[in-house]
Amino acid sequence: VHLSGEEKSAVTSLWGKVKVDEVGGEALGRLLVVYPWTQRFFDSFGDLSSASAVMGNAKVKAHGKKVLDSFSEGLQHLDSLKGTFAKLSELHCDKLHVDPENFRLLGNVLVVVLARHFGKEFTPQLQAAYQKVVAGVATALAHKYH
């Protein structure tokens, strides 16, 4: 991901304030509600029958935290995302058969959740930087599909 020094420091500065468990659960929950076809990858998560069931689901929250823990790792290796996410890309491609488009969708949902949590602090410039990051992560996760 090609970020200026200013963009990198803005991204990492904001990320230091992110409550990974809260934001991760909300982002994954919103993905499952807004794009219901993504629920097919989470059959073992129990009740996903309504928006409130999804958003209150402990397994959704736990997996959302796990996803953002990996994202946090990626933020420390912005210049080598493909290597950082190689194993996860392989897992999602070969074993889980996740449509790689879902990574892009989740990245965009994450940006929405960050905007919701940080309000005016999440400036258009910061959004632009985060869009670059989530696009880079989505591309890295889709790498093994090609």
Swiss-Prot record:
The modification S-nitrosocysteine is found at C93. Transmembrane segments: none annotated. GO terms for biological process: hydrogen peroxide catabolic process. Keywords: Acetylation, Heme, Iron, Metal-binding, Oxygen transport, Phosphoprotein, S-nitrosylation, Transport. Red blood cells. The keyword Amino-acid biosynthesis does not apply. The modification Phosphoserine is found at S44. The modification N-acetylvaline is found at V1. CDD domains: Hb-beta-like. Heme b binds at H63, H92. The modification N6-acetyllysine is found at K59, K82, K144. One of its GO terms (molecular function) is metal ion binding. It comes from the Eukaryota. PROSITE patterns: GLOBIN. Residues 2-146 form the Globin domain. GO terms for cellular component: blood microparticle; haptoglobin-hemoglobin complex; hemoglobin complex. The modification Phosphothreonine is found at T12. Heterotetramer of two alpha chains and two beta chains. Belongs to the globin family. Involved in oxygen transport from the lung to the various peripheral tissues. This is Hemoglobin subunit beta. It comes from Cynopterus sphinx (Indian short-nosed fruit bat).
